[in-house]
């Protein structure tokens, strides 16, 4: 298997990369500077979202999203066990309980047919994970969430750029997370 040649990519864009890095070094705004505002604008436009907020990691973005929704002790979050540990970890960090729904054999994403059975009066959020560049059926997931008065957070760490029904990953739910 041939790997991506990062050095060749760098050399192709070396002048632009170094000029942008020098600009950051000169103005000294290593975080929250104009380059970040530019990146956030480009990310939002790319996925068709009204806003994009960059943070340190995908893990941080999931935790921030849960906290912004007021998820805490006694709440449940429906997600999948077949994902990186951060997805379940942040649910526990905010004091909530992860409720696992198995994956569908066809695409390794959450089995949408099993979500409704996992919803209880304590459920606050559906947190499906898009894996291997594939997205679960967000039309059905969003409809279930609406029916039950739940929020949806898309964990799109592995699907940035994927599309479904003309919408890009990170633009199919009110809150999405990528890394």
Regions found by a protein language model. Name each.
Residues 29-76, 90-94, 100-102, 167:
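Phosphate-binding glycine-rich loop
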Residues 67-159, 163:
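PLP-dependent aminotransferase-like
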Residues 154-179:
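Conserved active-site segment immediately N-terminal to the catalytic lysine
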Residues 18-22, 40-44, 63, 67, ...:
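Solvent-exposed, non-membrane alpha-helical residues enriched in polar/charged side chains
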Residues 1-29, 34:
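N-terminal "arm"/small-domain region of PLP-dependent enzymes with the aminotransferase-like
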């Amino acid at each position: 298997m041939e790997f991506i040649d990062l050095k060749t990519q760098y050399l192709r864009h070396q002048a632009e990369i170094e000029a942008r890095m020098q600009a950051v070094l000169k103005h000294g705004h290593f975080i929250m500077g104009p380059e970040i505002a530019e990146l956030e604008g480009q990310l939002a436009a790319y996925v068709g979202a009204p806003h994009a907020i960059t943070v340190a990691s995908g893990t941080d973005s999931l935790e921030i999203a849960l906290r912004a929704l007021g998820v805490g002790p006694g709440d449940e979050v429906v997600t999948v066990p077949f994902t990186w540990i951060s997805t379940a970890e942040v649910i526990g960090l905010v004091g909530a309980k992860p409720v696992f729904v198995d994956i569908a054999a066809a695409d390794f994403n959450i089995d949408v047919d099993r979500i409704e059975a996992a919803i209880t009066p304590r459920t606050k959020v559906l947190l499906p994970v898009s894996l291997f560049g594939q997205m679960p059926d967000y039309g059905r997931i969003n409809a279930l969430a609406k029916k039950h008065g739940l929020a949806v957070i898309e964990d799109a760490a592995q699907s940035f750029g994927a599309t479904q029904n003309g919408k890009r990953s990170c633009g199919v739910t009110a809150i999405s997370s990528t890394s």
